[in-house]
Amino acid sequence: MSGAGPLDGLLVVALEQAVAAPFATRQLADLGARVIKIERAGAGDFARGYDTSVLGQASYFVWLNRGKESVELDVKSDEGRAVMAALLARADVFVQNLAPGAAERLGLDAAGLLARHRRLICCSVSGYGPDGPYAAKKAYDLLVQCEAGLLSVTGTPDVPCKAGISVADIAAGMYAYTGVLTALYERERTGRGSSFTVSLLDALGEWMTQPYLYTVYGGREPRRTGARHASISPYGPYQARGGEVFIGLQNEREWAVLCDKVLARSDLITDERFTTNPDRVKHDDELTAIIEDVLASMTPDEVVARLDAAGIASARLRTPAEFAAHPQLAARDRWREADTPGGPVRALLPPVTVPGREATMGAVPALGQHTEAVLAEFLPGRTA
């Protein structure tokens, strides 16, 4: 940022891999924290090997690990244990997403660490939480999407589908990040550290609350409707001449405006099939046919222009490449360069925008790039 970031001077030790924990700690790094990432000796974070699409590097790793220092370490060895002890003695935050039971076997459980380091904040990220029948079960994003019910409400009537991004991991990473910030704020008041856990199932479960409420209290399962909204109509893609336009409504006022100003079908406002949103959802197929009949004479650009003039929300379906060239991002100067071992890459600024301050887009580290420097700093008497 312009000057020191809000977390400048904070030391985070991260024994992490994959997505959830690295997403949390990368956001801490964006705020100025010093993040020391411990990677497995000889292999590193296995996310380094997911693909080679970004100048020979994995897209997930480049996204999630900028601004960190990479230390290659065998944490099971005597030296590895000594290094971890030295790091944690000075750390403010310890984040780990090891396999179930691994932290305890390594002597890195939260209870033991807090007994030795009273101001340390310990964050443990897991698939299903520290107890219960699923505690020891391995968890990956798609599998947690299944267990949380997300696939049951996503896709077409015939085929359930996963979300196109690692939504369970991302959810857990966000809650781990905010959990760390909350614990830091609490430490300012109490002078003591604390520990907390975040599970992928709990994180995604929070996001699945509306479908749960709809199902359990409404007595019916949400429909899988592809790109359409399951409980609001009209809301989704509609075919125009030469392409689709996505339209979204939220209330009866907007419905009346759509009928009058966009469709030129004010008679639909009083049509008993479409009087309320539940009515429109019930008769969605009929309504879709009516809307698309009107839009068939207009190009997508003409439809969007008419929707904009009427104040009705709309969107065009974009690919990732088209998103990267989005005119709104360009107009707001949202792109920066981040260094990687393979060369500079474009990266989006973090979503939180503070006037006069800009997040530091730190470099993505090579495996073990900072090992010797960190060991010399934290174990100055060590002999190689």
Language-model segments: which ranges?
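N-terminal helix-loop segment corresponding to the beta1-alpha1 unit
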Residues: M1-G179, A183-R189, D301, A338, ...
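Terminal low-complexity tails and localization/encapsulation signals of metabolic enzymes
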Residues: M1-L11, R223, Q239-A240, A321-A384
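Short, well-structured beta-strand/strand-turn elements
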Residues: V35, D308-E322, G381-A384
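Glycine-rich beta-alpha junction loops
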Residues: G42, Y128-G129, L200-G205, G242-E244, ...
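Short Gly/Pro-enriched turn/cap motifs at secondary-structure boundaries
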Residues: F61, T225-A230, Y235-G236, I247, ...
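Conserved Rossmann-fold dehydrogenase catalytic segment
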Residues: P130, P157-I165, E188-L204, R223-A230, ...
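Oxidoreductase and adenylate-handling cofactor-binding alpha/beta cores
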Residues: G173-G193, E206-Y217, D260-A264, I269
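Aromatic-enriched alpha-helical interface/lid elements that frame and gate functional surfaces
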Residues: S233-A310, S314
